[in-house]
Amino acid sequence: MSAQTMLIGNRPCRIYGEAHAEYLLFQMTGEHELQSMDDEVAAIAQSNRKYLFAAIPAESWNDALSPWEAPAVWGKQGFGGNAADTLRFLTEQVIPTLEQQYPLPENVKIILGGYSLAGLFALWASTQANLFCGIAAASPSVWFPGWMEFEQRHPMQAQRVYLSLGDKEEHTKNAVMAAVGDNI
């Protein structure tokens, strides 16, 4: 299925799927993920469910997807803690725009997914909004400083949560990131 690019809040969002969807799927993306997006959507299409999928670019990966500020754990770039702004963009601009452009049933099931820091964002967003029926977090950055303490005090509101972890993440030489295996 080919993508349609829709400008939402000056961001070029890639939209796949159809109106009257049973599922409304969102994924915050970085440049590194766009090349594999068509394959991901092809796998989703095999479910034979009606869906509308929006790939939403994160303007600054470390800043836009981190729930609070934190120092760099590798390299020099820290984390800006702007996840609340990203969630607000999703709920106040992206969802209303898609509802305006595509007729969707009132009971459409909304699922938020992401990989790495976008996976952490999806988990965090589920603690902030009772909007998502499901969360899909692939190799989420649950090593993020303070995440485990936060998660214990703020339960997720999604009905379903999918977590996966690759073979290499917990074996990295970076001690902070290696905690992902214990934290997932």
Residue ranges and their predicted role:
Residues 26-30, 139, 165:
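The conserved beta1-alpha1 loop
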